[in-house]
Amino acid sequence: MKKLVSLCLALAMLATIFAVPAFAAEDKPYAGVKLTYWVKLHENLDAAKVTNMAQTRWYEAVKEATGIEIEFIHPAAGQDGTEFNLLTAVPDEMPDIVEYSWTAYPGGASAAIDDEVIISLNDVIASGKAPHLKAILDNEVAIDKAVKTADGDYYVFPFLRGTTFEDNNCLFTSGFYMRGDILKELGLEVPETIDEWDAVLRAVKAAHPDMIPFITRTEWMNQIFTPGYDNYWDYYVEDGVVKNGLVEDSHFEYLKKMASWYADGLIDPDYLTHTKAGDGRGIMAAGNAFATYDACGGGASNIFPYLLEAGLISDESDMVTTVPVTSVKGQNAKFSKMNGLYDASGSSAAISKRLADEGGEKFEAAVYLLDWMYSDEGHMINCFGIEGESYNMVDGYPTFTDVVLHNPDGLNVAAALSLYARGHQNGPVVQDTRVNDQYYSYSAQVAGMKLWTKTDFGKYMYPAGAAIATDNADDFATITANIKTYKDEHEAKWITGQEELTEDAWNAYVAQMEAFGLSRAIQYKQAAYDAFMAN
Protein backbone atom coordinates (compact mmCIF):
# COMPACT_ATOMS: atom_id res chain seq x y z
CA MET A 1 0.00 0.00 0.00
CA LYS A 2 2.85 2.36 0.91
CA LYS A 3 4.48 1.84 -2.48
CA LEU A 4 1.16 2.33 -4.24
CA VAL A 5 0.60 5.68 -2.51
CA SER A 6 4.18 6.76 -3.21
CA LEU A 7 3.81 5.68 -6.82
CA CYS A 8 0.61 7.67 -7.27
CA LEU A 9 2.21 10.78 -5.77
CA ALA A 10 5.31 10.34 -7.89
CA LEU A 11 3.31 9.86 -11.09
CA ALA A 12 1.33 13.01 -10.33
CA MET A 13 4.56 14.89 -9.79
CA LEU A 14 6.09 13.57 -12.99
CA ALA A 15 2.99 14.49 -14.95
CA THR A 16 3.45 18.06 -13.75
CA ILE A 17 7.18 18.22 -14.30
CA PHE A 18 7.38 16.57 -17.67
CA ALA A 19 4.26 17.95 -19.32
CA VAL A 20 6.05 18.38 -22.66
CA PRO A 21 7.24 15.88 -25.26
CA ALA A 22 10.59 14.39 -24.32
CA PHE A 23 13.54 15.13 -26.54
CA ALA A 24 14.23 12.42 -29.06
CA ALA A 25 17.42 11.38 -27.34
CA GLU A 26 18.32 9.01 -30.16
CA ASP A 27 18.76 12.03 -32.44
CA LYS A 28 21.50 13.45 -30.20
CA PRO A 29 21.60 16.78 -32.07
CA TYR A 30 24.77 17.88 -30.29
CA ALA A 31 26.66 14.59 -30.28
CA GLY A 32 30.39 15.16 -30.03
CA VAL A 33 30.13 18.71 -28.66
CA LYS A 34 32.46 19.23 -25.70
CA LEU A 35 31.54 21.50 -22.80
CA THR A 36 33.43 22.63 -19.72
CA TYR A 37 31.53 22.38 -16.42
CA TRP A 38 32.79 23.83 -13.11
CA VAL A 39 31.28 22.13 -10.06
CA LYS A 40 32.28 21.18 -6.54
CA LEU A 41 33.03 17.47 -6.18
CA HIS A 42 30.46 16.13 -3.73
CA GLU A 43 31.86 14.57 -0.57
CA ASN A 44 29.98 11.34 -1.31
CA LEU A 45 32.08 10.91 -4.44
CA ASP A 46 35.20 11.53 -2.42
CA ALA A 47 34.07 8.70 -0.14
CA ALA A 48 33.74 6.51 -3.24
CA LYS A 49 37.36 7.34 -4.20
CA VAL A 50 36.26 9.27 -7.27
CA THR A 51 38.36 12.32 -8.17
CA ASN A 52 36.34 13.55 -11.15
CA MET A 53 32.66 13.25 -12.08
CA ALA A 54 33.72 11.95 -15.49
CA GLN A 55 34.63 8.71 -13.70
CA THR A 56 31.03 8.02 -12.65
CA ARG A 57 28.44 5.82 -14.27
CA TRP A 58 26.10 8.82 -14.03
CA TYR A 59 28.25 10.75 -16.49
CA GLU A 60 28.55 7.75 -18.78
CA ALA A 61 24.74 7.54 -18.85
CA VAL A 62 24.38 11.27 -19.54
CA LYS A 63 26.94 11.09 -22.34
CA GLU A 64 25.25 8.05 -23.85
CA ALA A 65 21.82 9.71 -23.74
CA THR A 66 22.83 13.13 -25.09
CA GLY A 67 26.05 12.52 -26.99
CA ILE A 68 27.53 15.58 -25.27
CA GLU A 69 30.99 15.30 -23.72
CA ILE A 70 31.74 17.18 -20.52
CA GLU A 71 35.08 18.22 -19.06
CA PHE A 72 34.43 18.60 -15.34
CA ILE A 73 36.50 21.13 -13.44
CA HIS A 74 36.48 20.68 -9.67
CA PRO A 75 37.83 23.15 -7.10
CA ALA A 76 40.15 21.78 -4.45
CA ALA A 77 38.37 20.35 -1.42
CA GLY A 78 37.38 23.11 0.96
CA GLN A 79 38.45 25.81 -1.49
CA ASP A 80 35.31 26.11 -3.60
CA GLY A 81 34.45 29.59 -2.28
CA THR A 82 37.93 30.94 -2.89
CA GLU A 83 38.24 29.38 -6.32
CA PHE A 84 34.74 30.56 -7.27
CA ASN A 85 35.76 34.14 -6.46
CA LEU A 86 38.90 33.79 -8.59
CA LEU A 87 36.89 32.20 -11.39
CA THR A 88 34.26 34.92 -11.55
CA ALA A 89 36.84 37.69 -11.31
CA VAL A 90 37.80 36.99 -14.95
CA PRO A 91 34.48 36.52 -16.82
CA ASP A 92 36.19 36.18 -20.20
CA GLU A 93 37.85 32.97 -19.01
CA MET A 94 34.79 31.37 -17.41
CA PRO A 95 33.95 27.73 -18.13
CA ASP A 96 30.84 27.08 -20.22
CA ILE A 97 28.68 26.07 -17.26
CA VAL A 98 29.22 26.97 -13.61
CA GLU A 99 27.33 25.28 -10.78
CA TYR A 100 27.23 27.23 -7.53
CA SER A 101 24.96 28.95 -5.03
CA TRP A 102 24.51 32.12 -7.07
CA THR A 103 22.80 33.98 -4.24
CA ALA A 104 26.25 33.92 -2.58
CA TYR A 105 27.74 35.98 -5.40
CA PRO A 106 28.49 39.53 -4.11
CA GLY A 107 25.29 41.44 -4.80
CA GLY A 108 23.43 38.25 -5.68
CA ALA A 109 22.46 36.78 -9.03
CA SER A 110 21.46 40.18 -10.45
CA ALA A 111 24.99 41.40 -9.90
CA ALA A 112 26.39 38.27 -11.56
CA ILE A 113 24.31 39.11 -14.63
CA ASP A 114 25.24 42.80 -14.53
CA ASP A 115 28.92 41.88 -14.15
CA GLU A 116 28.58 39.71 -17.28
CA VAL A 117 29.58 36.59 -15.39
CA ILE A 118 26.41 34.65 -16.26
CA ILE A 119 23.45 35.31 -18.53
CA SER A 120 19.78 35.98 -18.02
CA LEU A 121 17.90 32.93 -19.27
CA ASN A 122 14.78 34.89 -20.19
CA ASP A 123 15.36 34.73 -23.94
CA VAL A 124 16.35 31.07 -23.74
CA ILE A 125 13.14 30.15 -21.94
CA ALA A 126 10.87 32.43 -23.98
CA SER A 127 12.25 31.04 -27.24
CA GLY A 128 11.29 27.48 -26.32
CA LYS A 129 14.87 26.21 -26.15
CA ALA A 130 14.35 24.91 -22.61
CA PRO A 131 10.91 23.25 -22.83
CA HIS A 132 11.29 20.95 -19.83
CA LEU A 133 12.34 23.69 -17.44
CA LYS A 134 9.65 25.96 -18.88
CA ALA A 135 7.01 23.32 -18.17
CA ILE A 136 7.96 23.38 -14.49
CA LEU A 137 7.96 27.18 -14.36
CA ASP A 138 4.59 27.37 -16.11
CA ASN A 139 3.00 24.87 -13.74
CA GLU A 140 4.56 25.94 -10.44
CA VAL A 141 4.19 29.67 -9.73
CA ALA A 142 6.16 29.49 -6.46
CA ILE A 143 9.15 27.97 -8.24
CA ASP A 144 8.84 30.35 -11.17
CA LYS A 145 9.13 33.32 -8.83
CA ALA A 146 11.86 31.77 -6.69
CA VAL A 147 14.30 31.22 -9.55
CA LYS A 148 14.11 34.81 -10.79
CA THR A 149 15.96 37.87 -9.59
CA ALA A 150 14.13 40.94 -8.29
CA ASP A 151 14.54 42.33 -11.81
CA GLY A 152 12.66 39.37 -13.27
CA ASP A 153 15.63 37.50 -14.73
CA TYR A 154 15.80 33.73 -14.71
CA TYR A 155 19.40 32.91 -13.97
CA VAL A 156 19.82 29.18 -13.28
CA PHE A 157 18.75 25.72 -14.18
CA PRO A 158 17.75 25.11 -10.56
CA PHE A 159 18.21 22.48 -7.92
CA LEU A 160 14.65 21.70 -6.80
CA ARG A 161 13.51 19.64 -3.82
CA GLY A 162 10.42 18.50 -5.68
CA THR A 163 7.66 20.75 -6.98
CA THR A 164 5.12 20.78 -4.13
CA PHE A 165 5.08 21.28 -0.36
CA GLU A 166 2.50 18.52 0.07
CA ASP A 167 3.82 15.18 1.40
CA ASN A 168 7.28 16.05 0.12
CA ASN A 169 10.00 14.27 2.08
CA CYS A 170 12.69 15.94 -0.03
CA LEU A 171 12.20 19.11 2.03
CA PHE A 172 13.44 17.47 5.23
CA THR A 173 16.96 16.36 6.04
CA SER A 174 16.80 16.17 9.84
CA GLY A 175 14.44 15.29 12.67
CA PHE A 176 13.99 13.96 16.19
CA TYR A 177 15.39 10.62 17.35
CA MET A 178 14.76 9.11 20.76
CA ARG A 179 15.08 5.88 22.69
CA GLY A 180 11.83 4.03 22.12
CA ASP A 181 12.90 1.31 24.55
CA ILE A 182 12.98 3.86 27.36
CA LEU A 183 9.60 5.24 26.36
CA LYS A 184 8.25 1.69 26.55
CA GLU A 185 9.93 1.13 29.90
CA LEU A 186 8.23 4.23 31.31
CA GLY A 187 4.89 3.54 29.66
CA LEU A 188 5.03 6.76 27.65
CA GLU A 189 3.90 7.64 24.14
CA VAL A 190 6.07 9.41 21.58
CA PRO A 191 5.71 13.16 22.31
CA GLU A 192 4.19 15.61 19.82
CA THR A 193 3.37 18.79 21.78
CA ILE A 194 5.50 20.87 24.14
CA ASP A 195 3.52 19.61 27.14
CA GLU A 196 4.11 16.01 26.06
CA TRP A 197 7.81 16.68 25.52
CA ASP A 198 7.95 18.25 28.97
CA ALA A 199 6.33 15.22 30.58
CA VAL A 200 8.58 12.76 28.75
CA LEU A 201 11.84 14.58 29.49
CA ARG A 202 10.94 14.92 33.17
CA ALA A 203 10.04 11.24 33.41
CA VAL A 204 13.34 10.26 31.78
CA LYS A 205 15.28 12.52 34.14
CA ALA A 206 13.58 10.96 37.16
CA ALA A 207 14.10 7.38 36.00
CA HIS A 208 17.61 7.86 34.56
CA PRO A 209 19.22 10.74 36.49
CA ASP A 210 22.63 10.21 34.85
CA MET A 211 21.20 10.50 31.35
CA ILE A 212 20.82 13.82 29.50
CA PRO A 213 17.16 13.91 28.43
CA PHE A 214 17.74 16.01 25.30
CA ILE A 215 20.79 17.09 23.29
CA THR A 216 21.32 18.84 19.95
CA ARG A 217 23.28 21.60 18.21
CA THR A 218 23.01 25.16 19.52
CA GLU A 219 21.45 26.65 16.39
CA TRP A 220 18.81 23.94 16.17
CA MET A 221 17.51 24.28 19.73
CA ASN A 222 15.08 27.13 19.08
CA GLN A 223 14.36 26.07 15.51
CA ILE A 224 12.82 22.81 16.66
CA PHE A 225 10.92 23.82 19.81
CA THR A 226 9.55 27.30 18.99
CA PRO A 227 6.96 25.73 16.64
CA GLY A 228 5.37 24.23 19.75
CA TYR A 229 4.25 27.77 20.54
CA ASP A 230 3.26 28.59 16.96
CA ASN A 231 6.38 30.73 16.90
CA TYR A 232 9.05 31.10 14.24
CA TRP A 233 12.61 32.23 14.86
CA ASP A 234 12.96 34.45 11.79
CA TYR A 235 10.98 36.21 9.08
CA TYR A 236 7.81 34.58 7.80
CA VAL A 237 4.71 35.61 5.85
CA GLU A 238 1.11 35.38 7.04
CA ASP A 239 -1.74 36.61 4.85
CA GLY A 240 0.74 38.60 2.78
CA VAL A 241 2.22 40.36 5.82
CA VAL A 242 5.88 39.86 6.71
CA LYS A 243 6.55 39.22 10.40
CA ASN A 244 9.46 38.25 12.62
CA GLY A 245 8.79 35.81 15.44
CA LEU A 246 11.76 36.82 17.58
CA VAL A 247 9.82 39.58 19.36
CA GLU A 248 6.41 37.93 19.54
CA ASP A 249 4.96 37.01 22.94
CA SER A 250 5.01 33.36 21.90
CA HIS A 251 8.81 33.54 21.74
CA PHE A 252 8.84 34.81 25.31
CA GLU A 253 6.83 31.74 26.34
CA TYR A 254 9.26 29.49 24.48
CA LEU A 255 12.25 31.05 26.25
CA LYS A 256 10.63 30.57 29.65
CA LYS A 257 10.14 26.90 28.90
CA MET A 258 13.74 26.45 27.75
CA ALA A 259 14.99 28.20 30.90
CA SER A 260 12.97 25.81 33.06
CA TRP A 261 14.25 22.81 31.11
CA TYR A 262 17.84 23.95 31.52
CA ALA A 263 17.40 24.66 35.24
CA ASP A 264 15.86 21.23 35.77
CA GLY A 265 18.56 19.40 33.81
CA LEU A 266 16.32 18.38 30.93
CA ILE A 267 18.61 19.70 28.17
CA ASP A 268 22.33 19.32 27.74
CA PRO A 269 24.13 21.73 30.09
CA ASP A 270 26.83 22.21 27.43
CA TYR A 271 24.48 22.79 24.49
CA LEU A 272 25.98 26.24 23.83
CA THR A 273 29.28 24.59 22.88
CA HIS A 274 27.71 22.35 20.24
CA THR A 275 28.11 24.74 17.34
CA LYS A 276 28.82 22.47 14.37
CA ALA A 277 27.55 19.32 12.72
CA GLY A 278 28.12 16.23 14.82
CA ASP A 279 28.73 18.06 18.09
CA GLY A 280 27.14 16.13 20.95
CA ARG A 281 26.44 13.16 18.69
CA GLY A 282 28.91 10.99 20.57
CA ILE A 283 26.97 11.50 23.81
CA MET A 284 23.83 10.14 22.20
CA ALA A 285 25.76 7.29 20.54
CA ALA A 286 27.27 6.29 23.89
CA GLY A 287 23.82 5.92 25.41
CA ASN A 288 24.22 8.96 27.64
CA ALA A 289 21.27 10.89 26.19
CA PHE A 290 17.64 9.97 25.64
CA ALA A 291 16.71 12.12 22.63
CA THR A 292 18.30 14.30 20.01
CA TYR A 293 17.58 16.24 16.85
CA ASP A 294 20.03 15.34 14.10
CA ALA A 295 20.55 14.78 10.40
CA CYS A 296 18.56 11.94 8.90
CA GLY A 297 21.61 10.42 7.24
CA GLY A 298 24.74 11.40 9.13
CA GLY A 299 22.98 11.52 12.48
CA ALA A 300 21.31 8.12 12.50
CA SER A 301 24.21 6.34 10.81
CA ASN A 302 26.61 7.66 13.45
CA ILE A 303 24.35 6.90 16.43
CA PHE A 304 22.31 3.75 15.85
CA PRO A 305 25.18 1.32 15.05
CA TYR A 306 27.10 2.26 18.20
CA LEU A 307 24.05 1.79 20.42
CA LEU A 308 23.54 -1.63 18.85
CA GLU A 309 27.18 -2.68 19.14
CA ALA A 310 27.28 -1.66 22.79
CA GLY A 311 24.09 -3.59 23.49
CA LEU A 312 22.36 -0.44 24.71
CA ILE A 313 19.45 -1.18 22.40
CA SER A 314 18.46 -4.67 21.32
CA ASP A 315 17.18 -3.72 17.88
CA GLU A 316 17.36 -0.65 15.66
CA SER A 317 13.59 -0.32 16.01
CA ASP A 318 14.25 0.73 19.61
CA MET A 319 15.07 4.13 18.11
CA VAL A 320 11.97 6.11 17.14
CA THR A 321 11.10 9.51 15.72
CA THR A 322 8.17 11.91 15.85
CA VAL A 323 6.46 14.80 14.08
CA PRO A 324 7.64 18.43 14.23
CA VAL A 325 6.57 19.89 17.59
CA THR A 326 3.01 21.14 17.26
CA SER A 327 0.81 23.36 19.40
CA VAL A 328 -2.20 21.05 19.00
CA LYS A 329 -1.81 17.29 19.14
CA GLY A 330 -2.82 15.62 15.90
CA GLN A 331 -2.57 18.81 13.86
CA ASN A 332 0.26 19.80 11.54
CA ALA A 333 2.83 22.12 13.08
CA LYS A 334 2.43 25.67 11.81
CA PHE A 335 6.20 26.04 11.54
CA SER A 336 9.13 23.65 11.40
CA LYS A 337 12.73 23.33 10.31
CA MET A 338 12.27 22.77 6.58
CA ASN A 339 13.97 23.50 3.28
CA GLY A 340 12.33 25.38 0.42
CA LEU A 341 11.45 23.89 -2.96
CA TYR A 342 14.18 25.95 -4.57
CA ASP A 343 17.18 25.59 -2.33
CA ALA A 344 19.09 28.78 -3.11
CA SER A 345 21.81 27.70 -0.68
CA GLY A 346 22.47 24.65 -2.84
CA SER A 347 24.27 24.80 -6.15
CA SER A 348 22.41 25.33 -9.42
CA ALA A 349 23.77 25.58 -12.95
CA ALA A 350 24.25 28.85 -14.83
CA ILE A 351 25.61 29.51 -18.32
CA SER A 352 28.57 31.84 -18.62
CA LYS A 353 28.27 35.11 -20.49
CA ARG A 354 31.46 34.20 -22.36
CA LEU A 355 29.82 31.11 -23.84
CA ALA A 356 26.65 33.02 -24.72
CA ASP A 357 28.71 35.69 -26.49
CA GLU A 358 30.46 33.01 -28.50
CA GLY A 359 27.07 31.54 -29.38
CA GLY A 360 26.92 28.78 -31.92
CA GLU A 361 26.66 25.07 -31.37
CA LYS A 362 28.36 24.97 -27.97
CA PHE A 363 25.93 27.47 -26.48
CA GLU A 364 22.96 25.60 -27.94
CA ALA A 365 24.39 22.33 -26.59
CA ALA A 366 24.76 23.79 -23.08
CA VAL A 367 21.11 24.85 -23.06
CA TYR A 368 20.03 21.47 -24.44
CA LEU A 369 22.07 19.54 -21.86
CA LEU A 370 20.84 21.48 -18.86
CA ASP A 371 17.22 21.38 -19.97
CA TRP A 372 17.50 17.65 -20.72
CA MET A 373 18.18 17.16 -17.00
CA TYR A 374 14.48 17.94 -16.39
CA SER A 375 13.21 15.56 -19.07
CA ASP A 376 11.76 12.19 -18.11
CA GLU A 377 14.95 10.44 -19.18
CA GLY A 378 17.18 12.98 -17.46
CA HIS A 379 15.13 12.84 -14.29
CA MET A 380 15.41 9.07 -14.02
CA ILE A 381 19.16 9.10 -14.62
CA ASN A 382 19.68 11.96 -12.17
CA CYS A 383 17.62 10.35 -9.43
CA PHE A 384 17.97 6.61 -9.96
CA GLY A 385 20.88 6.04 -12.33
CA ILE A 386 20.91 3.22 -14.85
CA GLU A 387 18.00 0.82 -15.22
CA GLY A 388 19.10 -2.77 -14.85
CA GLU A 389 22.18 -1.74 -12.93
CA SER A 390 21.44 0.69 -10.09
CA TYR A 391 17.66 0.21 -10.22
CA ASN A 392 14.94 -1.96 -11.72
CA MET A 393 11.33 -1.10 -12.46
CA VAL A 394 9.18 -3.26 -10.16
CA ASP A 395 5.44 -2.85 -10.75
CA GLY A 396 6.14 0.57 -12.22
CA TYR A 397 8.24 1.64 -9.24
CA PRO A 398 11.99 2.40 -9.64
CA THR A 399 13.57 0.11 -7.06
CA PHE A 400 17.24 0.34 -6.16
CA THR A 401 19.34 -2.78 -6.57
CA ASP A 402 21.95 -4.14 -4.18
CA VAL A 403 24.58 -2.22 -6.13
CA VAL A 404 23.19 0.79 -4.25
CA LEU A 405 21.58 -0.61 -1.12
CA HIS A 406 24.13 -3.33 -0.31
CA ASN A 407 27.14 -2.34 -2.34
CA PRO A 408 29.52 -5.26 -2.99
CA ASP A 409 32.52 -2.96 -2.57
CA GLY A 410 31.39 -1.91 0.89
CA LEU A 411 30.28 1.61 -0.04
CA ASN A 412 27.47 3.09 2.01
CA VAL A 413 24.24 3.97 0.22
CA ALA A 414 25.16 7.64 -0.22
CA ALA A 415 28.52 6.87 -1.81
CA ALA A 416 27.19 4.04 -3.97
CA LEU A 417 24.28 6.10 -5.28
CA SER A 418 26.64 8.99 -6.04
CA LEU A 419 28.33 6.85 -8.65
CA TYR A 420 25.03 6.56 -10.53
CA ALA A 421 22.92 9.62 -9.73
CA ARG A 422 22.94 13.27 -8.66
CA GLY A 423 19.44 13.82 -7.33
CA HIS A 424 20.49 13.47 -3.68
CA GLN A 425 23.23 16.07 -4.11
CA ASN A 426 22.78 19.37 -5.98
CA GLY A 427 22.71 20.59 -9.55
CA PRO A 428 20.05 21.04 -12.25
CA VAL A 429 17.69 18.34 -11.01
CA VAL A 430 14.27 17.80 -9.46
CA GLN A 431 14.53 15.49 -6.47
CA ASP A 432 12.20 12.50 -6.27
CA THR A 433 10.46 11.34 -3.08
CA ARG A 434 10.86 7.73 -4.22
CA VAL A 435 14.60 8.04 -3.61
CA ASN A 436 14.13 8.91 0.05
CA ASP A 437 11.56 6.14 0.41
CA GLN A 438 14.41 3.67 -0.21
CA TYR A 439 17.53 5.63 0.67
CA TYR A 440 17.35 5.08 4.41
CA SER A 441 17.52 1.70 6.11
CA TYR A 442 16.67 2.31 9.76
CA SER A 443 12.98 2.23 10.67
CA ALA A 444 13.18 5.63 12.41
CA GLN A 445 14.61 7.18 9.25
CA VAL A 446 11.92 5.62 7.09
CA ALA A 447 9.21 6.78 9.49
CA GLY A 448 10.79 10.23 9.61
CA MET A 449 10.37 10.64 5.88
CA LYS A 450 6.61 10.53 6.52
CA LEU A 451 6.28 12.13 9.94
CA TRP A 452 8.52 15.14 9.34
CA THR A 453 6.24 16.33 6.55
CA LYS A 454 3.46 17.01 9.09
CA THR A 455 3.81 20.78 8.92
CA ASP A 456 2.08 23.66 7.16
CA PHE A 457 5.21 25.78 7.01
CA GLY A 458 5.06 25.91 3.22
CA LYS A 459 2.18 28.40 3.61
CA TYR A 460 4.29 30.76 5.72
CA MET A 461 7.84 30.40 4.41
CA TYR A 462 9.48 33.65 3.32
CA PRO A 463 10.53 33.08 -0.30
CA ALA A 464 14.26 32.72 -0.83
CA GLY A 465 14.10 34.72 -4.05
CA ALA A 466 12.70 37.86 -2.41
CA ALA A 467 15.90 39.92 -2.30
CA ILE A 468 16.33 43.15 -0.36
CA ALA A 469 16.62 46.19 -2.64
CA THR A 470 20.22 47.25 -3.25
CA ASP A 471 19.64 50.68 -1.68
CA ASN A 472 18.56 49.02 1.57
CA ALA A 473 21.00 46.12 1.60
CA ASP A 474 23.72 47.71 3.75
CA ASP A 475 21.28 49.00 6.35
CA PHE A 476 19.51 45.64 6.46
CA ALA A 477 22.82 43.83 6.91
CA THR A 478 23.77 46.10 9.82
CA ILE A 479 20.39 45.64 11.50
CA THR A 480 20.58 41.87 11.02
CA ALA A 481 24.08 41.63 12.50
CA ASN A 482 23.13 43.70 15.55
CA ILE A 483 19.94 41.74 16.15
CA LYS A 484 21.67 38.37 15.86
CA THR A 485 24.44 39.29 18.27
CA TYR A 486 22.00 40.72 20.80
CA LYS A 487 19.59 37.79 20.44
CA ASP A 488 22.27 35.11 20.80
CA GLU A 489 23.75 36.78 23.86
CA HIS A 490 20.50 37.38 25.73
CA GLU A 491 18.79 34.12 24.86
CA ALA A 492 21.85 32.21 26.08
CA LYS A 493 21.87 34.13 29.38
CA TRP A 494 18.15 33.65 29.94
CA ILE A 495 18.11 29.96 29.11
CA THR A 496 21.16 29.16 31.24
CA GLY A 497 19.90 31.29 34.14
CA GLN A 498 22.72 33.84 34.05
CA GLU A 499 19.99 36.47 33.86
CA GLU A 500 16.39 36.17 35.01
CA LEU A 501 13.79 36.27 32.26
CA THR A 502 11.07 38.58 33.54
CA GLU A 503 8.40 40.51 31.69
CA ASP A 504 10.35 43.71 32.29
CA ALA A 505 13.50 42.11 30.90
CA TRP A 506 11.58 40.87 27.88
CA ASN A 507 10.00 44.26 27.21
CA ALA A 508 13.41 45.92 27.41
CA TYR A 509 14.75 43.31 24.98
CA VAL A 510 11.96 43.98 22.48
CA ALA A 511 12.55 47.73 22.81
CA GLN A 512 16.24 47.26 22.05
CA MET A 513 15.39 45.19 18.99
CA GLU A 514 13.26 48.08 17.79
CA ALA A 515 16.13 50.48 18.52
CA PHE A 516 18.36 48.34 16.31
CA GLY A 517 15.83 48.85 13.51
CA LEU A 518 13.84 45.61 13.47
CA SER A 519 10.69 47.35 12.22
CA ARG A 520 12.71 48.92 9.43
CA ALA A 521 14.15 45.53 8.54
CA ILE A 522 10.64 44.08 8.39
CA GLN A 523 9.65 46.93 6.07
CA TYR A 524 12.59 46.08 3.80
CA LYS A 525 11.55 42.43 3.78
CA GLN A 526 7.93 43.41 3.09
CA ALA A 527 8.95 45.57 0.14
CA ALA A 528 11.11 42.74 -1.20
CA TYR A 529 8.25 40.28 -0.76
CA ASP A 530 5.74 42.57 -2.48
CA ALA A 531 8.11 43.09 -5.42
CA PHE A 532 8.75 39.36 -5.59
CA MET A 533 5.04 38.54 -5.67
CA ALA A 534 4.35 41.21 -8.29
CA ASN A 535 7.13 39.99 -10.57
List where the protein language model places each region:
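Flexible loop/turn segments at secondary-structure boundaries
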Residues: E43-A47, G78-T82, A104-A109, T163-E166, ...
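General small-molecule cofactor/ligand-binding pocket signal
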Residues: E69-P75, P269-D270, V320-V325
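Structured mid-domain segments that build the active-site/substrate or prosthetic-cofactor binding neighborhood
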Residues: N288-R354, E358-A415
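Helix-loop-helix "hinge/cap" segment bordering the ligand-binding cleft or interdomain interface
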Residues: N122-G128, G152-Y154, P158-M221, Y236-A295, ...
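Extracytoplasmic/periplasmic substrate-binding proteins
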Residues: L41-A54, T163-F165, N169-Y177, K184-V190, ...
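Sec-dependent N-terminal signal peptides of Gram-positive bacterial secreted proteins and lipoproteins
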Residues: L4-F23
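Conserved small-residue motifs centered on glycine
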Residues: W372, D376-T496
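Conserved N-terminal structural module of periplasmic/extracytoplasmic solute-binding proteins
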Residues: F23-E196, P227, W233-D234, V242-N244, ...
